[in-house]
């Protein structure tokens, strides 16, 4: 692949994540604010959180994939442009986000056991990522996108900075492939 086009591909991939992550985080925050303790409200909130968290997991996995697919190209960019991105990807790996995505969110069968992942194992993996209670989940969301995220170090800021850098590179202003 032509290096000039790699900047364009990365820019468009990051642009999607720049939209998807804040949206899912915002909806997740809203879902946590249960209006009452009725079983209907709890089930509704749990379903919304599940959808939001799965979207977040898939989006964060895409950052991991961008590093895998475009790592050589990203390595040619100035360190100050990629440092936060690479740190975020390391944190994604440390939090077992890729494992949860591959064992539960994106597949019905666990490749290790050749069976569906148990609900207990899925819950344990998710809790290791998002935390065990709402305050920890909100802290996880803040790592990705704090409510007033502009200019604050977070995953969305590193996505924006790398996207903007790629946009200005030769070939970065091309239409979506």
Specify the residue positions occupied by each region the protein language model found.
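Amphipathic alpha-helical interface segments
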Residues: 1-96, 111, 119-177
